[in-house]
Amino acid sequence: MADRQRWVIKIGSALLTNDGKGLDCALMQTWVDRMVALRERGIEVVIVSSGAVAEGMTRLGWSARPDSVHELQAAAAVGQMGLVQAWETRFQQHQLHTAQVLLTHDDLSDRKRYLNARSTLLTLLGFGVVPVVNENDTVVTDEIRFGDNDTLAALVANLVEADRLLILTDQEGLFDADPRSNADANLIREARASDPAIVRVAGGGGLLGRGGMATKVRAGKLAARSGAITTIASGRSPEVLIELADGQGPGTTLLPDTTPMNARKQWLAGHLQMRGRLVLDAGAVVRLREGGSSLLPVGVVDVFGQFSRGEMVACEDERGERVGCGLVNYDAADARRICRKKSAEIAGVLGFMNEEELIHRDNLVLMEAGSRVSGA
């Protein structure tokens, strides 16, 4: 193991609460003890912690989870106090401090705020503080929601350039079939995060997909973009942390590709909300994938959605498969007017020309083939 590593550890509500009814402080103490042991081995730790809503419900005396978004946000606000206090109290027993970091997708979609969040987290780690990260449920809306803490943890792993993302769950890892209905199901010990077959296994219907394994595999793909190894493992015992540090292999390990994206493209790839879609002809797809070119308007056959200059759009081929995503140089109305046109014709059509490309290659991230694009 390298002299110093950095791990992002995502712990779900089921591993921190008493059946969803408030925090299990004794169990949290065990988690903290094991994370302190990791630090003593030279492993920096960032925690992505669930449990705020469950703790808030207990403090408010609610026996049933509310349906109202505002009530859930209120519970999260109340519970976040208890969650942070619980982590801080237990780390202080080891003379360590924690820091609360609440994020929304907007924080990571804006380049300046992204860099500020990164600088803050790295500064905290430099001071020996343990960051405790969660989504800012009190103010978040559907438009800026990460959707789940697995995705948030992956983006944090990219943000701090973690060596490992550890997603702890109530399952042993990813199986090649549903182990609850198939006694012959085998645990997948290791795979490439970019392997499309892994996504199909995790989300190809049945209980595995509904149980959230698909989101964990997608998080592994996202974390792999910065070179992080992802391990999906059972968190029923906090000893899993020590086992992994000892080089043992519980769970499923998703390996990154050999060349991680540079910092800017990591940020671009972290945009989960696309403001629109550009449909590319076959020639444009080949030029992007094989030649590393910018996207010119002549290669765009259709434009969907409403977006402004500088916003993130998805690029897809004519079969609807993801090619990439990037920051567009023209708004939706202008993009529709210049699609299928040569760059030399832009000024004549619009009366001006911002750039000769619809998306410059420096602002474009290519995706592996076989990924469907959701409608914009």
Curated annotation (Swiss-Prot):
Binding, ATP: 10, 169-170
Any idea which UniProt keywords this protein has?
A: Amino-acid biosynthesis, ATP-binding, Cytoplasm, Kinase, Nucleotide-binding, Proline biosynthesis, Transferase
Q: Superkingdom of this entry's organism? A: Bacteria
Q: Which residues form a coiled coil?
A: none
Please state the pathway this protein functions in, per its UniProt record: Amino-acid biosynthesis; L-proline biosynthesis; L-glutamate 5-semialdehyde from L-glutamate: step 1/2
Give the catalysed reaction(s), semicolon-separated.
L-glutamate + ATP = L-glutamyl 5-phosphate + ADP
Query: Can you list the GO cellular component terms from the UniProt entry?
Result: cytosol
Output the Gene3D superfamilies linked to this UniProt entry: Acetylglutamate kinase-like, PUA domain
GO BP: L-proline biosynthetic process
Primary localization: cytoplasm
Check the record and name the PANTHER family matching this protein: GLUTAMATE 5-KINASE, ISOPENTENYL PHOSPHATE KINASE
What's the stated role of this polypeptide?
Catalyzes the transfer of a phosphate group to glutamate to form L-glutamate 5-phosphate.
This chain belongs to which protein, by name? Glutamate 5-kinase
Species annotation? Alcanivorax borkumensis (strain ATCC 700651 / DSM 11573 / NCIMB 13689 / SK2)
- Output the lineage of the source organism: Bacteria, Pseudomonadati, Pseudomonadota, Gammaproteobacteria, Oceanospirillales
